[in-house]
């Protein structure tokens, strides 16, 4: 079955294939943030509309949420990313990527996507533009195939080179540990962590570099993630596991020598984002990325707009109640 794509203009408009949230008053008035949700484990199809509502209502940004969809045009976190017995991997699609042309910031929450070349090219055009972007949780292994992105004839690696960290495994017990985030003391006055406190999420810590090494040159760690012994915020730390960076920033030098501000946070599951501290960290990073540090305050609201009840993370879709749904179900 062919997927029928109905794209709009470069300006975000209402569509049955993506969500738009017009900005109100606030420092973000007139600026456009695009949030891309296309993962299969961490319920970003719920969390990114929630974040878009906060950014539009409390901060004034125009927001567009783009979804990974199946061949029927449904938001489908159950699509496989590796061949399974009796099932082949089908291409993912993200309708509305033309909206990147008007974006001032993009937030990626993707995981092992197999995208058509035309869609990958639109993503590359943005990340090579010099504009800022944020990568959350699984976005550091966001694509199953290389992006068509070379600089001086050399293939560019999305996770390791652009973001500053690839997924190299779970640092602790997958779906059993949780993460306590603490701001790096030397960076306590950085604008991204202004007003940030009490970072906790029930996802585990990712390792993004080999043991005995560190973040790549040019990356500045902002938040350490300490694995806890359970999935409650007051659980004891796992003293056998060192804390690892879970949030950092860097600059990406594009093919034309432009410098894009990049922020990666390996926390960011749907349930992690119930933490106001984590939400503020990510929202502050957006301001920083767009060069709006002077507009970051410790008190501007990051409160959830309406109701937010994310499903638990995981691949046991039937048990969790994860099924394909129309985009409108996430408004």
Residue ranges and their predicted role:
Residues 13-28, 46-47, 57-58, 73, ...:
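Extracellular ligand-binding/catalytic regions of CAZymes and related secreted enzymes
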Residues 159-167, 185, 199-205, 211-217, ...:
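Oxidoreductase and adenylate-handling cofactor-binding alpha/beta cores
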Residues 15-18, 56, 62, 91, ...:
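Catalytic beta-strand/loop cores that center a nucleophilic Ser/Cys/Thr
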């Amino acid at each position: 079955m062919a997927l029928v794509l109905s794209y709009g203009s470069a300006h975000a408009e209402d569509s049955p294939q993506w969500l738009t949230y017009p900005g109100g008053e606030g420092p973000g008035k007139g600026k456009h943030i695009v949030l891309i949700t296309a993962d299969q484990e961490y319920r970003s199809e719920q969390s990114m509309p929630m974040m878009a509502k906060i950014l539009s209502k409390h901060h004034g940004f125009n927001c567009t949420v783009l979804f990974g969809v199946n061949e029927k045009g449904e938001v489908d976190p159950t699509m496989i990313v590796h061949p399974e017995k009796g099932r082949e991997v089908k291409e993912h699609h993200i309708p509305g990527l033309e909206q990147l042309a008007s974006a001032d910031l993009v937030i990626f929450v993707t995981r092992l996507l197999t995208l058509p070349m035309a869609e990958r090219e639109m993503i590359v055009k943005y990340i090579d533009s010099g504009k800022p972007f944020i990568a959350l949780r699984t976005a550091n292994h966001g694509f199953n195939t290389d992006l068509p992105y070379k600089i001086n004839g050399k293939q560019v690696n999305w996770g390791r080179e652009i973001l500053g960290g690839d997924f190299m495994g779970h640092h602790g017990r997958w779906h059993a540990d949780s993460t306590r985030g603490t701001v790096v003391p030397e960076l306590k006055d950085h604008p991204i962590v202004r007003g940030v406190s009490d970072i906790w999420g029930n996802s585990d810590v990712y390792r993004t570099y080999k043991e005995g090494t560190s973040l790549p040159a040019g990356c500045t760690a902002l938040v350490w993630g300490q694995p806890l012994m359970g999935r409650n915020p007051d659980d004891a730390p796992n003293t056998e596991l060192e804390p690892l960076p879970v949030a950092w920033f860097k600059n990406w030098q594009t093919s034309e020598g432009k410098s894009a501000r990049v922020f990666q946070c390996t926390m960011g599951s749907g349930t992690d984002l119930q933490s106001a501290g984590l939400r503020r960290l990510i929202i502050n990073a957006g301001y920083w990325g767009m060069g709006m540090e002077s507009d970051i305050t410790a008190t501007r609201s990051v409160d959830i707009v309406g109701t937010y009840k994310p499903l638990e993370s995981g691949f046991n879709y039937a048990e969790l109640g994860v099924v394909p749904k129309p985009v409108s179900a996430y408004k």
